[in-house]
Design a protein with these regions (language model features):
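Hydrophobic core residues within well-ordered beta-strands of beta-rich domains
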Residues: 124, 134-136, 274
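Hot-dog-fold acyl-thioester-processing enzymes
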Residues: 45-87, 210, 222-245
Length: 286
């Protein structure tokens, strides 16, 4: 099995994947995919060189799992940004290998600490299939006796050559909420080019593509179980106030996230489940 458990730091376990088709690293803290690099490709995910690896601290970059809320908690902004599951150690489940890649399963259930933050019983299963493409599926189950409503995201930081040579396609004509400054409802006209901070929630279940001229490749993100998608880049000023992000690294990534955000919230009755999933493929234009 090409999966090795080791420690990034004492008490901070990670899994390293060395497979003929792919290399990857996953932190047990947050079940956080830190690296996914298909053979023959540059790294597909951006990971901040200033990321903090401490229990209770979210990792900047890779694919954070945001749940059971996305963004600030609307009822209590003092609660952790983007929920709490990215800040907790998950349990490893079943791992397997095929000729084309590996499959890893991670599990998390409620406990006294999570119920202090959010008073509901739940079970989460995150499955990663890593190879030439990436597939991640977050299955959420209400294991309690009362309904609950969640928002969430698979917050993918995608590595690019240069923000000035990258565009995002597939959203022309789609309505979105622009959350930079005073929130406003807009409609996308053409592709997205980057010359300022972008933080938008799109009403879409379409595939979205990053056209990256800098690395001469396209990255296509396809979501399921989702009716919304977020496109984010912090740009210059916000990067300066994010302590775990180098000031100039805004030009190295674009976040295109499969989400259940804002109006796309999910309500689960007792015993019900929902799966939020994303698939990412890299192609080289001819």
């Amino acid at each position: 099995m090409p999966i090795l458990r080791t420690e990034l730091l004492p008490g901070y376990p990670i899994f390293q994947v060395q497979h003929p088709a792919v290399t990857a690293r996953i932190a047990l803290h947050g079940a956080h995919l830190m690296e996914w690099t298909p053979v023959g490709q540059a790294a597909a995910l951006y990971l901040s060189p200033q990321a903090v690896y401490e229990p209770g601290k979210a990792i900047r970059g890779g694919v954070p799992v945001c749940w059971p809320w996305f963004g600030p908690n609307t009822g209590d902004p003092s609660l952790p940004m983007h929920g709490f599951v990215r800040n907790r150690f998950w349990k490893p489940g079943d791992f397997s290998e095929t000729e084309t890649g590996v499959r890893l399963q991670f599990l998390l259930t409620d406990d006294a600490e999570t119920r202090r933050l959010w008073p509901h019983a739940f079970q989460l299963e995150l499955v990663m299939e890593l190879g030439a493409s990436l597939h991640m599926a977050l299955k959420m189950t209400n294991s309690g006796e009362v309904p609950f409503t969640i928002t969430g995201a698979l917050h993918t930081y995608l590595w690019i050559g240069d923000i000035h040579q990258a565009t995002v396609t597939g959203l022309d004509g789609i309505s979105y909420l622009d959350t930079v400054g005073t929130p406003s409802q807009q409609v996308q006209a053409g592709d997205i080019d980057f010359d300022r901070e972008v933080d938008r929630i799109y009403t879409t279940s379409h595939s979205i593509t990053i056209v990256d001229a800098g690395l001469a490749r396209n990255i296509t993100i396809s979501g399921s179980g989702s009716g919304s998608a977020v496109v984010w880049n912090p740009w210059i000023e916000k990067s300066k106030i994010l302590a775990d992000l180098p000031d100039g690294d805004y030009h190295r990534f674009i976040c295109v996230e499969t989400t259940n955000a804002r109006w796309d919230s999910i309500t689960l009755a007792a015993g019900e489940s929902h799966v939020l999933a994303t698939e990412i493929k890299i192609t080289v234009p001819s």
